[in-house]
Design a protein with these regions (language model features):
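Intrinsically disordered, low-complexity regulatory segments of kinases
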Residues: 1-255
């Protein structure tokens, strides 16, 4: 938005609405210190629907972190924590670097389709992210479950949430299946935006679960992903329809 810096405060509020304040409360219930701010402000939403973006230019930069896979048997990942694979959190060597990319792609795919992150945490804390992985995808491998130092702050031994939960997190989000239902914005097969009867919801869940398999060797390759049911029956046909629509009704080039 090239004209954003030139907006006055009133013009900014008129275009993007008033700031949203939320009171700050301490986890232990005690009153805040005198120097602490009484409120936090939600970030301003600058996003727009994808179908309203004209001629988007995607610029990719590796920030000097890319590497040649065959020549780098155990790379150091520079992936942001929210999108990092679980093996990186547990300090295991990245021996399947393409599998790490598949996990990251799966997390991104969910966010693109769902309009919100799959693993929602405060300040991208590593332990909160691990807990969200388990909450969404199920029990991790035993070696990770047993070696997780702060597991007792989240889960009982049987995998249930601790009753006296004191982390800055929200342990109420459902499993991946329920999140996909919520993403479909409907509570029945008739009102859900997914083609539930035709198998779209199931096929999408199968795709995402495969991409976010805890064990790296169990994740599909990129070539295998292209042959998954969701890609063949829904993603590719939707892409072809979109290309046909663009060729029939070219987007207005004026901004």
């Amino acid at each position: 938005m090239p004209d954003l810096d030139g907006l006055s405060t009133s013009e900014l509020y008129k275009r993007f609405d008033q700031p949203r304040e939320v009171p700050i409360q301490r986890v232990d219930g005690k009153p805040g210190e005198p120097h602490a701010p009484p409120h936090a402000i939600y970030p301003m939403a600058l996003s727009i629907p994808a179908d309203e973006v004209h001629d988007p230019e995607i610029i990719i930069s590796d920030k000097r972190t890319s590497f040649i896979v065959p020549q780098t048997p155990s790379p150091t990942l520079c992936t942001p924590a929210l999108y990092s694979p679980p093996e990186d959190f547990f300090n295991e060597p990245i021996t399947h670097s393409t599998a790490a990319d598949i996990w990251t792609l799966g997390v991104n795919l969910y966010e693109v389709l769902g309009e919100r992150p799959l693993f929602e945490t405060f300040a991208w804390d590593g332990d909160d992210i691990i807990a969200e992985m388990i909450n969404s995808l199920g029990q991790p491998p035993t070696r990770w479950w047993n070696s997780w130092v702060k597991r007792s702050e989240f889960f009982e031994e049987d995998g249930s949430w601790v009753a006296d939960f004191r982390r800055i997190s929200t342990p109420v989000f459902g499993r991946l299946h329920q999140r996909l239902w919520d993403m479909g914005r409907g509570e029945t097969e008739q009102t859900c935006e997914w083609d539930v009867a035709g198998g779209e919801l199931r096929a999408l869940e199968d795709l995402l679960r495969a991409m976010m398999t805890f064990e790296p060797p169990g994740r599909p390759t990129a070539d295998q992903l292209l042959r998954y049911e969701y890609m063949v029956k829904w993603a590719f046909p939707a892409w072809e329809r979109q290309k046909m629509q663009e060729s029939t009704h070219p987007a207005d080039k004026e901004h």
